[in-house]
């Protein structure tokens, strides 16, 4: 509506209103009128008179990513969007469509939700993704069919990860990747809260912190936990402050895993 605002203008028939003025009194009047009629309203650059925000959008339909600062800094939202645009391939929308087409078939074949999540994670890390990006959908169909035919219950594995001195920016890329895919995280006293925030949100987290003459879980108990969860087919992240082997007992844990036939990886940390 390109006209001066008047209180006689009824907004009740609109679902959404944007007040694009630089007059706070007008914004206030539009806001109050919308509030009275239960209409969503956004006043540009005037957060107190907003009932919704307009985020910066990365559109890879059906995949959509939105970035917002709750009106605090739209410029920052756009800057972050620009950074993310470069890291999200344009073919991601095709991959989402492809996944949706196969979702029911995969669910019928792999009924356990944790195993199904692992299947999709492994599939997205395989050559299938590039086939979909390049519109080679027949080849992609063959790859997922083959993956379903050859699917076996995943075997457990342990990741001995050094969390470094506590600064999340000092984590290695591999450490971060394994932390975010682990089903169980067993961590000690020296692992900082910001580091723990980077672990997978729904992972089971078990504290086994040690202080002098006060071990919440003795080393034998920690070894047993690692073997137990890995034997259940879970991916276990043993997260240690610093490096797993410097002032740590990673060597003992490896011996126990080796004796039990459990696969493991070691990721050094900055000390």
Identify what each model region corresponds to:
Residues 1-25, 155-160, 180-270:
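Class I S-adenosyl-L-methionine
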Residues 1-74, 78-84, 138, 181, ...:
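Adenine nucleotide-associated cytosolic modules
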Residues 28, 77-78, 172-173, 219-220, ...:
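Conserved strand-to-helix beginnings and helix N-cap segments that scaffold or border functional pockets
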Residues 37-52, 90-96, 256-271:
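Short, acidic/small-residue loops that bind anionic groups at enzyme active sites
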Residues 53-57, 149-150, 174-175, 227:
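A generic local secondary-structure boundary/capping motif
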Residues 71-152:
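An accessory alpha-helical subdomain
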Residues 153-154, 160-168:
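Flexible loop/N-cap segments at domain edges
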Residues 166-168, 173-178:
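Cofactor-pocket helix-loop regions in the catalytic cores of large enzyme subunits
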């Amino acid at each position: 509506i390109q006209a001066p605002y008047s209180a006689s203008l009824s907004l009740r028939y609109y679902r959404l209103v944007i007040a694009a003025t630089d007059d706070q009194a007008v914004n206030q009047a539009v806001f109050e009128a919308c509030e009275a009629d239960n209409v969503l309203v956004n006043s540009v650059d005037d957060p107190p008179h907003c009932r919704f925000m307009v985020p910066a959008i990365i559109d890879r339909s059906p995949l959509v990513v939105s970035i917002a600062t709750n009106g605090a800094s739209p410029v920052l939202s756009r800057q972050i969007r620009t950074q993310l645009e470069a890291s999200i391939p344009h073919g991601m929308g095709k991959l989402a469509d492809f996944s949706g087409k196969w979702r029911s078939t995969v669910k019928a074949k792999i009924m356990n939700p944790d195993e199904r999540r692992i299947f999709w994670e492994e599939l997205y890390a395989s050559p299938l993704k590039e086939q979909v990006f390049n519109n080679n959908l027949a080849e992609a169909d063959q790859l997922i069919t083959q993956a379903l035919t050859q699917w076996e219950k995943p075997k457990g594995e342990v990741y001995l990860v050094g969390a470094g001195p506590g600064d999340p920016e000092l984590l290695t890329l591999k450490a971060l990747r394994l932390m975010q895919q682990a089903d169980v995280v067993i961590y000690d006293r020296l692992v900082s809260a910001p580091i723990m925030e980077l672990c997978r949100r729904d992972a089971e987290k078990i504290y086994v912190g040690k202080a002098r003459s006060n071990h919440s879980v003795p080393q034998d108990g920690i070894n047993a936990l690692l073997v137990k969860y890995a034997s259940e087919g879970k991916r276990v992240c043993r997260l240690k402050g610093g490096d797993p082997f410097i002032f740590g007992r990673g060597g003992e844990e490896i011996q126990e895993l080796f004796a039990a036939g459990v696969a493991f990886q070691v990721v050094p940390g900055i000390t």
